[in-house]
């Protein structure tokens, strides 16, 4: 009765839990860390049925979720520094999520914790509902599996065990028979002693008496037989003691032989299992060694996929690992670029610029240039410069161009503290180390001499956005934000991400112009000046770090007179290039990494770009 009462009481206690119902479903937009290329992306997240799923957007829910995790064993960890971020991990799978604000994050965490509590692993009621049946089924199946596997390969041992069972039964019967024999013998001896005592008492007169002459009178033989009768126990005449003893010895010998055989089988089985154990131990050792090696290799590689290992003030990656990861990413990009160039050469892609007179009018910009002839001169070039079309940045453009023409062409000697970092043939790259608030602001200056091209051609290809993707390999995408004049535009471009560094974007004004020669002996000079500006159409965003630039490409054309009355060919022209770059990368990249990347990438850029110009202008009329 008490059991029924306790059962009913426990059932009534569970009723409130049943009536509480399932946890409330939740859905909304969260930022999810996708990968190191795309970073944080907005995703439509749904919390339902103890599972967290995400979709690319709310409109694409009908196409199925992009991913889902069960919350039964999930671990929810709010980030220590980012108040809007929280991480959800299930075994090796980790989701990095960011809410709009800390309150929004806490609401999601509370909802997820509620679903986790009501899941199969977190609720006591769920354990009571599911535990018993699982335990019974698993216990029964486990026992049957063990029994079958234990004796499937042990027929000989099983037969010997059956023999020992038979020997045991025989031995028990023999022991019972011998015990009965010994008990009967003991009873017979006891009865004989009682009977002898009685005979002695009843026949005292039969014992010898003393005569008058001193001699003894002895009793007859019959009295002796009464006093010492022959001991023959009753009821055991049918037992063959000798035969039973022989059989007992044979049975024990059989048991010992069977035990010996069983021990031999077990020793063989033990040897077999020992060999298997040794193999498994060796396999485990090799697996652990391979695992350690794999973990070591993963640590060497850029395996950190989470946001904690990207560039930032609280990055968990050290400077050496940062440099190794950046170098590995740049090597991959170089390999991809080499494959792309090889494919272009194989397919013989057509040039992007037309030949002839149309060459001088690239894109939609007004460069009026007649085909060169001996009668034409440099002064005949009609360029619509920035001074002709006044815009709101005109004064700033004039100042930038004037500064570059004054200071950028100066010699690197003297007190400028320029350091020669790379020298390859005619190309020399100099650097001056400058840091401000921990940010590397090293000015860079490169000089180069390229045969067969003019300064106008080099600057034209450098400025023209229509051919930008043909030679620039670091840009992910770009577009012209505003056209200020025919030779002045504002460009917004996003550079390819080099993990673990953050992605960079640049918003800058790009202008091209010809600098008139002061004297007849001065070389023809063209300049492209790119410097950062602000524009409402390209505001700052959270995905990229906005870099600031002040870059100038200054090109001077030197012409050596041809022999005789021959026309000037590309063999007679030489372009002296001065490339100046002042870049503020922003962010938190280590100084040593930035300097190493600059030392590696700037010479590659200059060689790649000048080779591209030589390739595109080969066989075409000269553009002075």
From Swiss-Prot:
Q: Which reaction does it catalyse?
A: N-hexadecanoylsphing-4-enine(in) = N-hexadecanoylsphing-4-enine(out)
Residues bearing Phosphotyrosine? 372
Its post-translational modification remark reads: Phosphorylation on Ser-132 decreases the affinity toward phosphatidylinositol 4-phosphate at Golgi membranes and reduces ceramide transfer activity. Inactivated by hyperphosphorylation of serine residues by CSNK1G2/CK1 that triggers dissociation from the Golgi complex, thus down-regulating ER-to-Golgi transport of ceramide and sphingomyelin synthesis.
Source domain of life is Eukaryota
* InterPro entries, per the entry: PH-like_dom_sf (IPR011993), PH_domain (IPR001849), STARD11_START (IPR041952), START-like_dom_sf (IPR023393), START_lipid-bd_dom (IPR002913), START_lipid_transfer (IPR051213)
Bias (Polar residues): 1-11
Q: What is the effect of changing residue 132 to A?
A: Abolishes the phosphorylation. Strongly reduces the interaction with phosphatidylinositol 4-phosphate. Increases the ceramide transfer activity
Every copy of the START domain together lies at 389-618
Task: Relate the outcome reported for changing residue 493 to A.
Answer: No effect on ceramide transfer activity
Mutating residue 138 to C has which effect? Found in a patient with intellectual disability
Q: Which consequence is recorded for altering residue 530 to A?
A: Reduces ceramide transfer
Q: Which PROSITE patterns match?
A: PH_DOMAIN (PS50003), START (PS50848)
Function per UniProt: Shelters ceramides and diacylglycerol lipids inside its START domain and mediates the intracellular trafficking of ceramides and diacylglycerol lipids in a non-vesicular manner.
How does it associate, per the subunit comment?
Answer: Interacts with VAPA and VAPB. Interaction with VAPB is less efficient than with VAPA. Interacts (via FFAT motif) with MOSPD2 (via MSP domain).
Disease association reads: Neurodevelopmental disorder with hypotonia, speech delay, and dysmorphic facies: An autosomal dominant disorder characterized by mild to profound developmental delay with hypotonia, delayed motor skills, impaired intellectual development, poor or absent speech, and behavioral abnormalities. Some patients are non-verbal and non-ambulatory. Additional features may include early feeding difficulties, poor overall growth, seizures, brain imaging abnormalities, and dysmorphic facial features.
What's the name of the protein? Ceramide transfer protein
Native source species: Homo sapiens (Human)
């Amino acid at each position: 009765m008490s059991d029924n009462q306790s059962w009913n009481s426990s059932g009534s206690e569970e009723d409130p839990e049943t009536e509480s119902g399932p946890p409330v479903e939740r859905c909304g937009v969260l930022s999810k860390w996708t990968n190191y290329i795309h970073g944080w992306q907005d995703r439509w997240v749904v919390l339902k049925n103890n599972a967290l799923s995400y979709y690319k957007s709310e409109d694409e829910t009908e196409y199925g979720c992009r991913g889902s995790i069960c919350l039964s064993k999930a671990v929810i960890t709010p980030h220590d520094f980012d108040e809007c971020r929280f991480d959800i991990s299930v075994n090796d799978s980790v989701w990095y999520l960011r809410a709009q604000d800390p309150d929004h994050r806490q609401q999601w965490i509370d909802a997820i914790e509620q679903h986790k509590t009501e899941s199969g692993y977190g609720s006591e009621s769920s354990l009571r509902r599911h535990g018993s049946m699982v335990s019974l089924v698993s216990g029964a199946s486990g026992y049957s599996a063990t029994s079958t596997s234990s004796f499937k390969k042990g027929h000989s041992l099983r037969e010997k065990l059956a023999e020992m069972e038979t020997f045991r039964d025989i031995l028990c019967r023999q022991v019972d028979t011998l015990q009965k024999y010994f008990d009967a013998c003991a009873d017979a001896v006891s009865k004989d002693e009682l009977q002898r005592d009685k005979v002695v008492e009843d026949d005292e007169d039969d014992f010898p008496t003393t005569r008058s002459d001193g001699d003894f009178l002895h009793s007859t033989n019959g009295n002796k037989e009464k006093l010492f009768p022959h001991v023959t126990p009753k009821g055991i005449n049918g037992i063959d003691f000798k035969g039973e003893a022989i059989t007992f010895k044979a049975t024990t010998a059989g048991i010992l032989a069977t035990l010996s055989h069983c021990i031999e089988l077990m020793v063989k089985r033990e040897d077999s299992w020992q060999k298997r154990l040794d193999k498994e131990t060796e396999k485990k050792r090799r697996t652990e060694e391979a695992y350690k090696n794999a973990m070591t290799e993963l640590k060497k590689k850029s395996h950190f996929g989470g946001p904690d290992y990207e560039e930032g003030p609280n990055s968990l990656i050290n400077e050496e690992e940062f440099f190794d990861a950046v170098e590995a990413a740049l090597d991959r990009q170089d390999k991809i670029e080499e494959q792309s160039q090889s494919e272009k050469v194989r397919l013989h892609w057509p040039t992007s610029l037309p030949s002839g007179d149309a060459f001088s009018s690239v894109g939609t910009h007004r460069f009026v240039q007649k085909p060169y002839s001996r009668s034409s001169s440099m002064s005949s070039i009609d360029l619509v410069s920035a001074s002709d079309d006044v815009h709101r940045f005109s004064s700033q453009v004039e100042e930038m161009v004037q500064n570059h023409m004054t200071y950028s062409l100066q010699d690197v000697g003297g007190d400028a503290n320029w350091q020669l970092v790379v020298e390859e043939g005619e190309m020399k790259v100099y650097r001056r180390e400058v840091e401000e608030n921990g940010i590397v602001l090293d000015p860079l200056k490169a000089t180069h001499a390229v045969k067969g091209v003019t300064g106008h051609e080099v600057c034209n290809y450098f400025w023209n956005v229509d051919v930008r993707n043909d030679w620039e390999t670091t840009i992910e995408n770009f577009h012209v934000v505003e056209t200020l004049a025919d030779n002045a535009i504002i460009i917004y471009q996003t550079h390819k991400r080099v993990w673990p560094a953050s992605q960079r974007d640049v918003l800058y004004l790009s202008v091209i112009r010809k600098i008139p020669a002061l004297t007849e002996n001065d070389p023809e000079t063209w300049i492209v000046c790119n410097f950062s500006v602000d524009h409402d159409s390209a505001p700052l965003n959270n995905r990229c770090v906005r870099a600031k630039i002040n870059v100038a490409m200054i090109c001077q054309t030197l012409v050596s007179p041809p022999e005789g009355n021959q026309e000037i060919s590309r063999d007679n022209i030489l372009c002296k290039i001065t490339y100046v770059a002042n870049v503020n990368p922003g962010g938190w990249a280590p100084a040593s990494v930035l300097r190493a990347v600059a030392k590696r990438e700037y010479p590659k850029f200059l060689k790649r770009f000048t080779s591209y110009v030589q390739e595109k202008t080969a066989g075409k009329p000269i553009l002075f």
